[in-house]
């Protein structure tokens, strides 16, 4: 599928020596995770594991971590009250009864709450990870113990990554009819290896900008054969997950990996979309001097009005202390940029894919890689200069730290409703194209989360609703409204 190959996958290429390759895929858990290093050298694919019910329909690092993972999930549920509320409201009618959902997302305590919600609503689920470093091993174990067919562990190799996806899709006697994807790799694999599966698929729900790009490429080429829902560009994803989640998690990820002090540091953020805006706001608040690079004049003007200098990367690359990519594009930071960085410059990515930083160009004999701590590599030039590369250019927050549970509840609720909508839509409502969520659905997701803040909406009077030409119950904004 040529359309997919235009957007390289997040796993990238792994061409280092065996010793470095092993250190790059050690089964480190996230900073909040329980770890058991006794069997780190044994691949989960080589183990024979069963849960307490005797099932072996999973592949995780260590099923014995399930009890700890269950506690992590229960803690997440406390801050995901809206998703739990949706689960309770819809559990009786089972809107996903008969749904067979194959998913490829980050596997964390928060996504586990989503997966178990889908199961409670009647779906059967098979799940793999969309990022080789973001899986919380104990959470994957808890899902496996609960009967979910999950194939994921932290520190997968590239071969492991595709093997896990294949195990989810290719199972005798079970065929998916819905796809929930984050990055497009699952969709790509089905197109490439099992195109006949799409005869049964009712729809695709895609969360990330990378995956959405790939869907639009297919649609433009006339090769998208099922309806797809673009969750990434929904208001509830863009304005909450992308902005507020990144505003908090960028600092967490950088602190945990580098212990950097932000006051007075010069930072360049590539991209001033919602992710970039969140990162910049957090860095500025702690006293960092922040520069922006942008291709879009509207976003660039927003950055200027927010008090940031908009520059070309080449203008500041020699002086900055930190480089952060937030574009969803490829080769934003090239080998030329990396060669010109000053000693100890920190380089990381807050976009979905690992293609934003040209990490492949650093896999050369003249450069030495030194793993100094989990997800932190020093790339050393012949003259002794070091560049600090985080998570091998993959997503910083989920690879190196955690993300705010409440914000992920908003995204997870949106994903659940999108799956329900596509699965239950009458024939003909959605064609073979990419769709945004209906405005009413966005508003419903937001309304479910307001009680957490003890927030109370004002209600329109009949006269006010008539004056504005609105239904008193919404939607309250036209589709063209920009929040």
Curated annotation (Swiss-Prot):
<dbReference type="GO" id="GO:0005783">
    <property type="term" value="C:endoplasmic reticulum"/>
</dbReference>
<dbReference type="InterPro" id="IPR000043">
    <property type="entry name" value="Adenosylhomocysteinase-like"/>
</dbReference>
<feature type="compositionally biased region" description="Low complexity">
    <location>
        <begin position="17"/>
        <end position="36"/>
    </location>
</feature>
<feature type="binding site">
    <location>
        <position position="294"/>
    </location>
    <ligand>
        <name>NAD(+)</name>
    </ligand>
</feature>
<keyword id="KW-1003">Cell membrane</keyword>
<feature type="modified residue" description="Phosphoserine">
    <location>
        <position position="24"/>
    </location>
</feature>
<feature type="region of interest" description="Interaction with BCL2L10">
    <location>
        <begin position="91"/>
        <end position="154"/>
    </location>
</feature>
<feature type="region of interest" description="PDZ-binding">
    <location>
        <begin position="473"/>
        <end position="483"/>
    </location>
</feature>
<dbReference type="GO" id="GO:0016324">
    <property type="term" value="C:apical plasma membrane"/>
</dbReference>
<dbReference type="Pfam" id="PF05221">
    <property type="entry name" value="AdoHcyase"/>
</dbReference>
<feature type="modified residue" description="Phosphoserine">
    <location>
        <position position="344"/>
    </location>
</feature>
<dbReference type="GO" id="GO:0003723">
    <property type="term" value="F:RNA binding"/>
</dbReference>
<feature type="modified residue" description="Phosphoserine">
    <location>
        <position position="37"/>
    </location>
</feature>
<dbReference type="GO" id="GO:0044233">
    <property type="term" value="C:mitochondria-associated endoplasmic reticulum membrane contact site"/>
</dbReference>
<keyword id="KW-0597">Phosphoprotein</keyword>
<feature type="modified residue" description="Phosphoserine; by PKD">
    <location>
        <position position="21"/>
    </location>
</feature>
<feature type="modified residue" description="Phosphoserine">
    <location>
        <position position="30"/>
    </location>
</feature>
<feature type="binding site">
    <location>
        <position position="237"/>
    </location>
    <ligand>
        <name>substrate</name>
    </ligand>
</feature>
<comment type="subunit">
    <text>Forms multimers. Forms heteromultimers with AHCYL2 (via the C-terminal region). Interacts (when phosphorylated) with ITPR1 (when not phosphorylated); the interaction suppresses inositol 1,4,5-trisphosphate binding to ITPR1. Interacts with BCL2L10; this strengthens the interaction of AHCYL1 with ITPR1. Interacts with CFTR and SLC26A6; the interactions take place once AHCYL1 is released from ITPR1 and increase CFTR and SLC26A6 activities. Interacts with RRM1; in a phosphorylation- and (dATP)-dependent manner.</text>
</comment>
<dbReference type="GO" id="GO:0044070">
    <property type="term" value="P:regulation of monoatomic anion transport"/>
</dbReference>
<keyword id="KW-0963">Cytoplasm</keyword>
<dbReference type="InterPro" id="IPR015878">
    <property type="entry name" value="Ado_hCys_hydrolase_NAD-bd"/>
</dbReference>
<protein>
    <recommendedName>
        <fullName>S-adenosylhomocysteine hydrolase-like protein 1</fullName>
    </recommendedName>
</protein>
<dbReference type="GO" id="GO:0006611">
    <property type="term" value="P:protein export from nucleus"/>
</dbReference>
<keyword id="KW-0554">One-carbon metabolism</keyword>
<dbReference type="GO" id="GO:0038166">
    <property type="term" value="P:angiotensin-activated signaling pathway"/>
</dbReference>
<comment type="function">
    <text>Multifaceted cellular regulator which coordinates several essential cellular functions including regulation of epithelial HCO3(-) and fluid secretion, mRNA processing and DNA replication. Regulates ITPR1 sensitivity to inositol 1,4,5-trisphosphate, competing for the common binding site and acting as endogenous 'pseudoligand' whose inhibitory activity can be modulated by its phosphorylation status. Promotes the formation of contact points between the endoplasmic reticulum (ER) and mitochondria, facilitating transfer of Ca(2+) from the ER to mitochondria.</text>
</comment>
<keyword id="KW-0492">Microsome</keyword>
<keyword id="KW-0472">Membrane</keyword>
<dbReference type="GO" id="GO:0043231">
    <property type="term" value="C:intracellular membrane-bounded organelle"/>
</dbReference>
<dbReference type="GO" id="GO:0030234">
    <property type="term" value="F:enzyme regulator activity"/>
</dbReference>
<dbReference type="InterPro" id="IPR020082">
    <property type="entry name" value="S-Ado-L-homoCys_hydrolase_CS"/>
</dbReference>
<feature type="binding site">
    <location>
        <position position="241"/>
    </location>
    <ligand>
        <name>substrate</name>
    </ligand>
</feature>
<feature type="region of interest" description="NAD binding">
    <location>
        <begin position="234"/>
        <end position="401"/>
    </location>
</feature>
<feature type="binding site">
    <location>
        <position position="329"/>
    </location>
    <ligand>
        <name>NAD(+)</name>
    </ligand>
</feature>
<feature type="binding site">
    <location>
        <position position="182"/>
    </location>
    <ligand>
        <name>substrate</name>
    </ligand>
</feature>
<dbReference type="GO" id="GO:1990456">
    <property type="term" value="P:mitochondrion-endoplasmic reticulum membrane tethering"/>
</dbReference>
<dbReference type="GO" id="GO:0005829">
    <property type="term" value="C:cytosol"/>
</dbReference>
<dbReference type="GO" id="GO:0033353">
    <property type="term" value="P:S-adenosylmethionine cycle"/>
</dbReference>
<feature type="region of interest" description="Disordered">
    <location>
        <begin position="1"/>
        <end position="56"/>
    </location>
</feature>
<keyword id="KW-0694">RNA-binding</keyword>
<feature type="region of interest" description="PEST">
    <location>
        <begin position="18"/>
        <end position="45"/>
    </location>
</feature>
């Amino acid at each position: 599928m040529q359309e997919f190959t235009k957007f390289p996958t997040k796993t990238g290429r792994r061409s280092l020596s065996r010793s470095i390759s092993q250190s790059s895929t050690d089964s480190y858990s996230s900073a909040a995770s329980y770890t058991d290093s006794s069997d780190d050298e044994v691949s989960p694919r080589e183990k024979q594991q069963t849960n307490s019910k005797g099932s072996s329909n999973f592949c995780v690092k260590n099923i014995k971590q399930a009890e700890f993972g269950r506690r992590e999930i229960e803690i997440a549920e406390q801050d995901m009250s809206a998703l739990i509320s949706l689960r309770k409201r819809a559990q009786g009618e089972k809107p996903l009864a008969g749904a067979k959902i194959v998913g490829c997302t980050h596997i964390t305590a928060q996504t586990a709450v989503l997966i178990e919600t889908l199961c409670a609503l009647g779906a059967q689920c098979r799940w793999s990870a969309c990022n080789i470093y973001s899986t919380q091993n104990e959470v994957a174990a808890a899902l496996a113990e609960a009967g979910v067919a999950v194939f994921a562990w932290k520190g997968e190799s590239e071969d492991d990554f595709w093997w896990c996806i294949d195990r989810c899709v290719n199972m005798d006697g079970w065929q998916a009819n819905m796809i929930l994807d984050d990055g497009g790799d699952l969709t790509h694999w089905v197109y490439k290896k099992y195109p006949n599966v799409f005869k049964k698929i009712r729809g695709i729900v895609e969360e990330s900008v990378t995956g959405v790009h790939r869907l639009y490429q297919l649609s433009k080429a006339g090769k998208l054969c099922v309806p797809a829902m673009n969750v990434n560009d929904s208001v509830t994803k863009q304005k909450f997950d992308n902005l507020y989640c990144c505003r908090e998690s960028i600092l967490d990820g950088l602190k945990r990996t580098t212990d950097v002090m932000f006051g007075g540091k010069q930072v360049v953020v590539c991209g001033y979309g919602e992710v970039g805006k969140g990162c910049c706001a957090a860095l500025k608040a702690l006293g960092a001097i922040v520069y922006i690079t942008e291709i879009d004049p509207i976003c660039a003007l927003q950055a200027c009005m927010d008090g940031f200098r908009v520059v070309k990367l080449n203008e500041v690359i020699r002086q900055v202390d930190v480089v952060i990519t937030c574009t969803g594009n490829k080769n934003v930071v090239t080998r030329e940029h990396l060669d010109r960085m000053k000693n100890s410059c920190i380089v990381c990515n807050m976009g979905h894919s690992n293609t934003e930083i040209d990490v492949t160009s650093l896999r050369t004999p003249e450069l030495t890689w030194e793993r100094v701590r989990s997800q932190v590599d020093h790339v050393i030039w012949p003259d002794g200069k070091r560049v600090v590369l985080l998570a091998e250019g993959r997503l910083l927050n989920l690879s190196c730290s955690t993300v705010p549970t409440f914000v992920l509840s908003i995204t997870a609720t949106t994903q659940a409703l999108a799956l329900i909508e596509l699965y239950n839509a009458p024939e003909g409502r959605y064609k073979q194209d990419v769709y945004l969520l209906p405005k009413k659905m966005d508003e419903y997701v937001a309304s479910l989360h307001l009680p957490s803040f003890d927030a109370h909406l004002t209600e329109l009077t009949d006269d006010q609703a008539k004056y504005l030409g609105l239904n008193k119950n919404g939607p309250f904004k036209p589709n063209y409204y920009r929040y």
